[in-house]
Amino acid sequence: MTSNNPNQPVSYPIFTVRWLSVHALAVPTVFFIGAISAMQFIQR
């Protein structure tokens, strides 16, 4: 984060495992929060 080198191959491929783990948790979480909040309005 503090390094200003765009060609830093130390931990650069974060879109392989970290991207999958973040989106595998974030996408269903946003979907379930939207679905649960929608159920709160259609129930009454």
Curated annotation (Swiss-Prot):
Family: Belongs to the PsbE/PsbF family.
Primary role: This b-type cytochrome is tightly associated with the reaction center of photosystem II (PSII). PSII is a light-driven water:plastoquinone oxidoreductase that uses light energy to abstract electrons from H(2)O, generating O(2) and a proton gradient subsequently used for ATP formation. It consists of a core antenna complex that captures photons, and an electron transfer chain that converts photonic excitation into a charge separation.
Subunit structure: Heterodimer of an alpha subunit and a beta subunit. PSII is composed of 1 copy each of membrane proteins PsbA, PsbB, PsbC, PsbD, PsbE, PsbF, PsbH, PsbI, PsbJ, PsbK, PsbL, PsbM, PsbT, PsbX, PsbY, PsbZ, Psb30/Ycf12, peripheral proteins PsbO, CyanoQ (PsbQ), PsbU, PsbV and a large number of cofactors. It forms dimeric complexes.
This protein's GO CC annotations: photosystem II reaction center; plasma membrane-derived thylakoid membrane
Cofactors named for this entry: heme b
Membrane topology: Single-pass membrane protein
TM helices/strands, residue ranges: 19-35
Cofactor mode of binding and number, as noted: With its partner (PsbE) binds heme. PSII binds additional chlorophylls, carotenoids and specific lipids.
GO MF annotations, alphabetized: electron transfer activity; heme binding; iron ion binding
Protein name: Cytochrome b559 subunit beta
NCBIfam families according to UniProt: cyt_b559_beta
Domain of life of the organism encoding this protein: Bacteria
Coiled-coil residue spans: none
Alphabetic keyword roster: Electron transport, Heme, Iron, Membrane, Metal-binding, Photosynthesis, Photosystem II, Thylakoid, Transmembrane, Transmembrane helix, Transport
Entry binding sites for heme: 23
Location of this chain's protein in the cell: Cellular thylakoid membrane
GO biological process, one term: photosynthetic electron transport chain
